[in-house]
Amino acid sequence: MTMSFVRKDRPTIVGMLRSTTADLLVAEIDRMLQQGVDAFGFQHEIVQADERNEENYKKIFSAMQGKPAYITNYVRCNVLDLTDEQLTEELFLLVKLGAKLVDLRCDLFDRQPDEYSTDPVAIEKQKKLIDQLHAMGVEVLMSAHVLKYTPYERVLEIALAQQARGVDVVKIVTEANSEQELAENFKISLALQEQIKMPVLFLCNGTHCRKHRIFAPLLDNGLYLAGEYGGPGVNQPTIQEAKEQLQLAGYNDLP
């Protein structure tokens, strides 16, 4: 299928929503539209349990005014204790109501500490799910939140495994807790572009992650996952910071 969520001409600015109720999400979306974003990231796992209903979802997607939505429904940070089958059911509802890029964990149906499963049964179920989502006209991102510094060889192994499962975007999150680890992560960002034949979202958390979060999207023409505001403990750049970097790099067609 033709890739549409990730831009080919420059990094895509994705406004990552952090609110937990429908009314607050609509207000946050409106503010982000005024700041200028290409798309939205709807982190469904943090939405309050009593706010999870079709009426609210329709209101949220409508507020995006036609901008595409990337949706996550992780186990981590989820306010409910749900099985992977239940999490998947919620994703299908969100797709029917307007989501365009769906995030599936790389350990879906076989939970692992680093979110990377090699279980053949789980992988086959993942592939069938990916085919179902493609048939619904949406794109699929597969994520592995390793959440520790990870050498290139291991990152490449995970990325190739994700690619082989039939997704449209590869996502891996590690850490950088020293200048050396930060430098290695920049090298990994560049190396993945030569080995992976699809958009790659390689991110890191940790004490030294900010430079990578700000500059790596310019190296791999990837996604800027950006927030409305920054502050202590916030790894993601703000929307304004992302746009400033793109302007400095010579991009003028910004939202």
Kindly give the residue locations of the regions a language model identified:
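A short, compositionally biased domain-edge/stem linker segment
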Residues: 1-3
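Active-site beta->alpha loop and helix N-cap motifs at the rims of alpha/beta catalytic domains
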Residues: 7-135, 139-152
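Catalytic alpha/beta core domains of metabolic enzymes, predominantly
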Residues: 107-255
